Amino acid sequence: MERIKELRDLMSQSRTREILTKTTVDHMAIIKKYTSGRQEKNPALRMKWMMAMKYPITADRRIMEMIPERNEQGQILWSKTNDAGSDRVMVSPLAVTWWNRNGPTTSTIHYPKVYKTYFEKVGRLKHGTFGPVHFRNQVKIRRRVDINPGHADLSAKEAQDVIMEVVFPNEVGARILTSESQLTITKEKKEELQDCKIAPLMVAYMLERELVRKTRFLPVAGGTSSVYIEVLHLTQGTCWEQMYTPGGEVRNDDVDQSLIIAARNIVRRATVSADPLASLLEMCHSTQIGGLRMVDILRQNPTEEQAVDICKAAMGLRISSSFSFGGFTFKRTSGSSVKREEEMLTGNLQTLKIRVHEGYEEFTMVGRRATAILRKATRRLIQLIVSGRDEQSIAEAIIVAMVFSQEDCMIKAVRGDLNFVNRANQRLNPMHQLLRHFQKDAKILFQNWGVEPIDNVMGMIGILPDMTPSTEMSLRGVRVSKTGVDEYSSTERIVVSIDRFLRVRDQRGNVLLSPEEVSETQGTEKLTITYSSSMMWEINGPESVLVNTYQWIIRNWETVKIQWSQNPTMLYNKMEFEPFQSLVPKAARGQYSGFVRALFQQMRDVLGTFDTVQIIKLLPFAAAPPEQSRMQFSSLTVNVRGSGMRIIVRGNSPVFNYNKATKRLTVLGKDAGALTEDPDEGTAGVESAVLRGFLILGKEDKRYGPALSINELSNLAKGEKANVLIGQGDVVLVMKRKRDSSILTDSQTATKRIRMAIN
């Protein structure tokens, strides 16, 4: 305080002020400090000092033609003296004001497009809600997070090619745009940025923000998706947090979230099929997430999650070298071990064959809600330092570490038999048996473990067998810490192999991942996941099976139509109709099938009775083994929404509704697609137009082979005959004309002849 008072007194004397303001600085050290090097040492001061001058700015000489010498108030805007050392003009800051007010204006249309990520960020903040501030200890752990909301997931190289193609299309250099996303983005951006006057370099920077994922290794407590990370500085400090709900979502977070859900669903479904690996690959290749192919997303998206990594491994992609156990990611930070098979007896005298890891090792364990450091020797836990959000999370981590340690007292704590099975009803391996057992009830494990007195160490406390904190005693080797353990920061990826049962191993044969590690958590995906594989239709329940079955028929209508008329049995046996059978009441399946097949046969026999909508509607019912009966049905029942709903054979119903005006089909109120051909148009327009250049000779003639679809006609040689399936399911015999005739007469004759051939 004394010194401050003294200073105040000194400053009140005018002499002190004079010395400080008037004295020249001539101390060599100071001069050196401020003049050596090109780097500005005091930018703020320099700016103030420069702006205090009359003409601190230089401009191109052309400015003299574009700006008056004086503004409305008569103040001088530019000086006639040249800037020393360049041929530029000295300009006053007032010139900038004049330019901003009166200078030429350009179109602003491109700004929101180029600076899209900024405009969107402002929108999210504007519509976001900030809640109360809470003061409490923050357990932050460093995680690799996405800091750039709203980006696509291109690799740096792919993005570079897109940017060059969009911003500098005439530059030399090979650019290969191969992936679908590259082509789509390039096309979109070229259209958006036509006649864009913004500096190309700026456009390139902004495009990079939009195309490439940027990650940083940051301390985070709470949400890790990019819309939370962009406000990290507003939502968490060292001892406080502010509640926040983002005012919008961004596609990249949605992709990450939906990818995890799709991968989990696919792994779970693959596990129960006859060949898990083949099924998994089939599903990954036929699934789309938000309109993008899942395999393309897997190749580009760095998300590390157990199910996602299993899918990546199946595709031959590299994954992180850490391994997963009990939902925690383990990364060995030091030590090494060798594996040996050993037999042990549980407390229930059941024999377990366990692969024991012999040797001293240290691991970090990172989970969603708890993290830990584990030091262990052969079948012995030396030390476990845990931190977590709450008692429950800490307990989860302790159980996993105790099982992982393979200690004898853990194995002896087992009561009852271990017979846990996976989804495919196969027994789990011994380590997962133990894990499941103690996850259900760990009381005996904690009680048998033993406690020890503890020293007072800053930031650490003990935890008792009933999971309450203590400063005197703790579970043997276990401590709870206030600070979290950082996630493994390296982005290194390794080559792995995967076996038929989806167990992923590194090159030394260590199991990194297996389906047992895939979380059972169910979530709702943010983006639409379209599982084209019929194996996945059951995933979202009966409604999804219904919608997907009809969507599949409509998507493949061209081929379905031909099979329907030529080879119905093959069509009825398609695997795509299997899930549908579970919706049809057991007792009625055979009868419905017999009825529908008979109806279809009648349509084939009587020309002109073909009815697209009816075939699509009834086809799935024909897949069950038919019962021959004379029964007729006016409606068929399907079990959806917890009860039987009716599909009307000759009309619309809430389950199956075809709108003639829009030509669209809705199934249970969901759009199932459009019929490309009009089922009600008789046979006139479409066919006559398509059959240009063909003569219709009459009804189908089997000698000329199976019916072709209209698209296949183009392969016929002149004068060649063929049966062709026209829109209404009728088959007629045609011949390719020998000469190119007038289109008009062709269409008219075609129409007449189709009518004659059919009637």
Swiss-Prot record:
Motif placement: Nuclear localization signal: 736-739
Name of the protein in its database record: Polymerase basic protein 2
Disulfide bonds listed in the record: none
Function: Plays an essential role in transcription initiation and cap-stealing mechanism, in which cellular capped pre-mRNAs are used to generate primers for viral transcription. Recognizes and binds the 7-methylguanosine-containing cap of the target pre-RNA which is subsequently cleaved after 10-13 nucleotides by the viral protein PA. Plays a role in the initiation of the viral genome replication and modulates the activity of the ribonucleoprotein (RNP) complex.
Annotated Pfam families: Flu_PB2_1st, Flu_PB2_2nd, Flu_PB2_3rd, Flu_PB2_4th, Flu_PB2_5th, Flu_PB2_6th, Flu_PB2_7th
Protein origin, superkingdom: Viruses
Cellular component, GO annotation: host cell nucleus; virion component
Biological process (GO), any one: 7-methylguanosine mRNA capping
